[in-house]
Amino acid sequence: MPDKTPFHRAMDELDALHAADPRRVEHEGASLPHELWHAGRMSAWLKRVVEAPGELVQLAVRSQHLQRWELPRSAYPEGRVGYLTWRRDQGKRAGETTARVMQAAGYSASDAAAVASMIRKQGLDRDPGAQAVEDCACLVFLESYFADFSKQVEHDHLIRIVQKTWGKMSPRARELALELSMSEEARAVVEEALSSG
């Protein structure tokens, strides 16, 4: 069997890191590490958002939540500032770790830096890779987390969150989001947000 490519070496190492997540999720009758499942959902959406995505975008999308459990949201103050600081720190950590994994697998420092930038979602308006990461993250949120999340958040705040999420998505991601299967309650929130946005 030929040696693995840098891409496959990096993906294998990233998935090994994902698999270390102690949190579990039940999926199709199997118990999986939560982060490995999340990474799989991100990659699955990428195939629908971007036609023939390149290796660097695939690595960025796969790593967006890398080792997120190691820095819990509860370690930061409540409220918007605490949330934004936590999210920024998570993106920085995930980008740095992914860059190290990539270089160890044989990628150049410039390719590793480009992926780290995509993970931090820098330049959404000018970097298609960063936009792909954002699109996949928004779609995974709407598909897998929104129904439960919507029960924990005050209605008007939830409407604003949906509007902000929608505003960050590309036209293709919005099209895919409208095709999602949702509960009646979740669908009503999305429709209200879009009609009043």
Question: Where are the predicted features?
Answer:
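Divalent metal-dependent phosphate-bond-processing catalytic cores, especially two-metal-ion Mg2+/Mn2+ enzymes
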Residues: 2-9, 16, 29-36, 40, ...
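Generic structural signal for well-ordered, non-membrane alpha-helices
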Residues: 12, 96, 100, 140-141
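Short domain-edge segments at the starts or junctions of modular domains/repeats
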Residues: 18-27
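A ubiquitous short alpha-helical element
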Residues: 26-30, 80-87, 127-128
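Generic, well-ordered alpha-helical segments
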Residues: 34, 38, 49-58, 86, ...
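Short, well-structured alpha-helical segments
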Residues: 43, 58-59, 112-120, 191
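His-Asp-centered metal-binding catalytic motifs of divalent-metal-dependent phosphohydrolases/nucleases
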Residues: 55-78, 94, 98, 117-123, ...
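Helix-adjacent hinge/juxtasegments
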Residues: 74-117
